[in-house]
Amino acid sequence: WLGKTQHLSVKEQLNLGVRYFDLRVNHVKNDYVIYHSIINGTRFDPILDDIASFIEENPSETLLLDFQHFKNGSDEYVYHTVLEKLKDHLVVQNNDQSELAFVDELRLKDTRGKCIVFFGDDSPFVKEAHIFSRNNDTCTQKGQALDSCYISSYHAMKSKQFIDEALGYYMDKIQTKKEEEGHKGIFVWQCQLTDSKLVFGPYHRERSHEANMNVFIENLPQQDYFSDINVIMRDFL
């Protein structure tokens, strides 16, 4: 329970409308599993099978697969398995734009029935035409196609302080990027609280945050920055 961040399987989340997944893969013995912090979870291959089946059966949908972290050299396996299982359902860059500009200018008509796959730029496979780069946790790198800022001290705050301080800081970061680099790319707004002391676990932290965060999200369409948001990340649907 200390590492668990969702009660529902990926298949169940897909059926409920989730279209972005933060996936972290660890190589353990002769298998590959999803992990969070020091805790290993379910096997990776069945998850990718569910994703492949969903996108095959729902050709109007678009999925974002954000491989935030790899462990024990798992990126090579993930790369080849994604290529094998998703095949014709991958967004591929076919021009000489920067990948930031390419992703930023994509429209839904370009991505229906496809997955956009992101790796950290420390993986050699990020150079491939169907793998796009994600920024580091502090979002200090230039030209990355996806930003998902995470500063651990913010996520250890109490709910109202987090909303007042952290979310504004993350939004300022992406708007500054858009102004300075001319493109925004995909912006994932990490809105979950975490249990930095490993006492109560993620579920307790999210329940203490849920009411405040739900009100905040309900009011987002009235904000002038609303169009800059691509993904709102939460734990425990």
Regions of interest found by a model, annotated:
Residues 1-237:
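Catalytic cores of phosphodiester-bond hydrolases, prominently lipid phosphodiesterases
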